[in-house]
Structures are given as C-alpha cells and as structure tokens.
C-alpha cells in the first residue's frame, strides 16, 4: 500500500502544472543610448548595497536601478579611475569594490567617492595591475 501511494503521488506531481513553480524573469537591455558608457561590458558585480557595477572599455558604470553613474580616468583628478578599460570587479568582506584595469588595480571608497590605487614598494617587484582579486575565508586578498 505504501509503495502504491508513493507511485501515485509521484505520478500526480508530474501531471500538475509547473507554472506555479516557475517565475518569468524580467530582463531589460541597456546600451549607451540608455546611459551605459560603452556597449561592451567585460564584467558585472552587484554589491552589498544593491548597486550594479559594469566594467567596460570606456569606464566603470554604477547603476542604481534608474540611472547610470559613470566613473572614468581623469588626469586632473588623482582619485579618479587609473584607466578606463576595466578587466574585473570584486567586492571584499569589508565592502570595498576592487577594480582591475588594464594598467592598475584600485579600490573604490564609498565614504569619499574616490578610487585609491594599489601600491607596492619598489623592492618587491610586484606588478601594478592584476586580472582577478579573490578573498579567502580568513579575509586575505589574493591578487592574480
């Protein structure tokens, strides 16, 4: 009897409409016509505050759900992005947004709305930029 009930319930579950189990996903396509700095997006990140970040060939784009804010390199602003070509993005456990560009690696500080480059002393011969940043369980950042 128990086997019969299991088979009956299994068969009935296959016959039930699955529309209640699935949800239609809503996608909106954004281009430079809607405010994105460039139509080619290399990386994307949703941060802990809910912002969407998009790295392009022409700067870093922060999207709040309504409009884009574009961050670009500006030689007259030392706290701007170091380069407009964004390779990858990463948010660490402290909420810092790390940005890997084609020439430097930096992090974004929400408090000052500024970018700060990652610097090394000349003695350790470290590169100025990396392609990826990750964090381990102990909070150590791994630069690759």
Regions found by a protein language model. Name each.
Residues 1-144:
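Carboxylate-rich, polar loop motifs that coordinate divalent cations or form catalytic acidic clusters
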């Amino acid at each position: 009897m128990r086997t019969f009930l299991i088979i009956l319930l299994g068969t009935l579950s296959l016959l039930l409409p699955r529309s209640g189990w699935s949800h239609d996903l809503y996608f909106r396509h954004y281009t430079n016509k809607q405010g994105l700095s460039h139509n080619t997006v290399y990386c994307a990140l949703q941060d802990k505050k809910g912002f969407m970040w998009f790295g392009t060939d022409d700067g870093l784009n922060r999207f709040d759900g309504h409009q884009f804010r574009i961050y670009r390199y500006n030689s007259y602003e030392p706290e701007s992005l170091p380069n407009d070509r964004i390779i990858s993005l990463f948010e660490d456990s402290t909420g810092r947004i790390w940005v890997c560009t084609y020439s430097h690696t930096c992090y974004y500080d929400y408090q000052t709305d500024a970018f700060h480059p990652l610097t090394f002393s000349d003695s350790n011969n470290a590169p100025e930029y990396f392609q990826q940043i990750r964090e381990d369980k102990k909070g150590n950042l791994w630069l690759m």
